[in-house]
UniProtKB/Swiss-Prot annotation:
The active site is at 196. Belongs to the ribose-phosphate pyrophosphokinase family. Class I subfamily. It comes from Neisseria meningitidis serogroup B (strain ATCC BAA-335 / MC58). Keywords: ATP-binding, Cytoplasm, Kinase, Magnesium, Metal-binding, Nucleotide biosynthesis, Nucleotide-binding, Transferase. Mg(2+) 1 binds at residue 134. PROSITE patterns: PRPP_SYNTHASE. It catalyses: D-ribose 5-phosphate + ATP = 5-phospho-alpha-D-ribose 1-diphosphate + AMP + H(+). One of its GO terms (biological process) is ribonucleoside monophosphate biosynthetic process. Pathway: Metabolic intermediate biosynthesis; 5-phospho-alpha-D-ribose 1-diphosphate biosynthesis; 5-phospho-alpha-D-ribose 1-diphosphate from D-ribose 5-phosphate (route I): step 1/1. One of its GO terms (molecular function) is magnesium ion binding. InterPro entries: PRib_PP_synth_CS (IPR000842), Pribosyltran_N (IPR029099), PRibTrfase_dom (IPR000836), PRTase-like (IPR029057), Rib-P_diPkinase (IPR005946), Rib-P_diPkinase_bac (IPR037515). This is Ribose-phosphate pyrophosphokinase.
Length: 327
């Protein structure tokens, strides 16, 4: 990709490695800024170069530590706004707080996803770019444009390179059926669904498998892996019902708590995730966990937004496996 006079990309401390990969694809340098903390823990931001009139992107996931990383975005956006940046887009590969998107049974809880959307708007951000939002309808919480892109092209390319035989794509729950069905269609593979239900109170949850998995390689697809507890239980259920191998592909490697050790001792043969969230050392050293990069996809999306080109074009079937999306 060629360099652009107006485009600038800044990052905080959440995932600088991904930001460096993105700017290499764009053939530009990463914006020069100091993002640190004062002695009392408050976020300290200083822009170290001119941004007046520029088209600026802040690339930062709001993974753990979620609040610190979110505050870095907000303070950096405020600094850019006060320095007269022409347009401010925040690229949030992993959008934290997305699971708090409703009030189930009208319980007294916040809708934190909406609160974060309001905070980003109030900070002076003009546009938001995300990857695989936990729920697509969160885009409606924003009063500014949102481009929610999908890691599917990257994951599909990786799956196809593995040349897996007897493949069945598995949705880990009813809510993930649309995603799993789309992947199965792209791979010309069978589809299975895990139906989790608790027969009655104080009775262990039962996992029913809808679909034929006997002797098959089962590929579980999901948007994120958090504690990996449900994923590991699903792998046990699939193996008990005759699955030959169990693989898992997910966009976001949240890996909270004992997730990595759970995966290492589970029935899962391999977990493949993208680099929207950086891996811990434990995850990097786990031979069952492998990471692929979405830097090429993010860079092309940034380029298209900056040039006022179509983003949805990237997800047409004809171009979903295009070389411009590869690392």
């Amino acid at each position: 990709m060629a360099a652009y006079d107006s485009l600038m990309v800044f990052t905080g401390n959440a995932n600088p490695e991904l930001a460096q990969r993105v700017v290499r694809h764009l053939d530009i340098s990463l914006g020069n800024a100091s993002v640190s903390k004062f002695s009392d823990g408050e976020v300290a931001v200083e822009l170290l170069e001119n941004v007046r009139g520029r088209d600026v992107f802040i690339l930062q996931p709001t993974c753990a530590p979620t609040n610190d990383n979110l505050m870095e975005i907000l303070t950096m956006a405020d600094a850019l706004k006060r320095a007269s940046a022409g347009r401010i887009t925040t690229a949030i590969p992993y959008f934290g707080y997305a699971r708090q998107d409703r009030r189930p049974r009208s319980v007294r809880v916040p809708i934190s996803a909406k609160l974060v959307a309001n905070m980003l708007y109030s900070a002076g951000i003009d546009r938001v770019l995300t990857v695989d939002l936990h729920a697509d309808q969160i885009q409606g919480f924003f009063d500014i444009p949102v481009d929610n892109i999908y890691a599917t092209p990257i994951l599909l390319n990786d799956i196809k390179q593995q040349r897996i035989e007897n493949l069945t794509v598995v949705s880990p729950d009813i809510g993930g059926v649309v995603r799993a069905r789309a992947v199965a269609k792209s791979l010309n593979a069978d589809l299975a669904i895990i139906d989790k239900r608790r027969p009655k109170a104080n009775v262990a949850e039962v996992m029913n498998i809808i679909g034929d998995i006997q002797g098959r390689t089962c590929l579980i697809v999901d948007d994120m892996i958090d504690t990996a507890n449900t994923l590991c239980k699903a792998a046990v259920a699939l193996k008990e019902r005759g699955a030959e191998r169990v693989l898992a592909y997910a966009s976001h490697a949240v890996f909270s708590g004992e997730a990595v050790s759970r995966i290492a001792s589970s029935e899962i043969d391999q977990v493949v995730v993208t680099d929207t969230i950086p891996l811990s050392e434990a995850a990097k050293n786990c031979d069952r966990i492998r990471q692929v990069t979405i830097a090429g996809l993010l860079a092309e999306t940034v380029r298209r937004i900056s040039n006022e080109e179509s983003v949805s074009y990237l997800f047409n079937e004809e171009v979903m496996t295009g070389s411009m999306l590869l690392p």
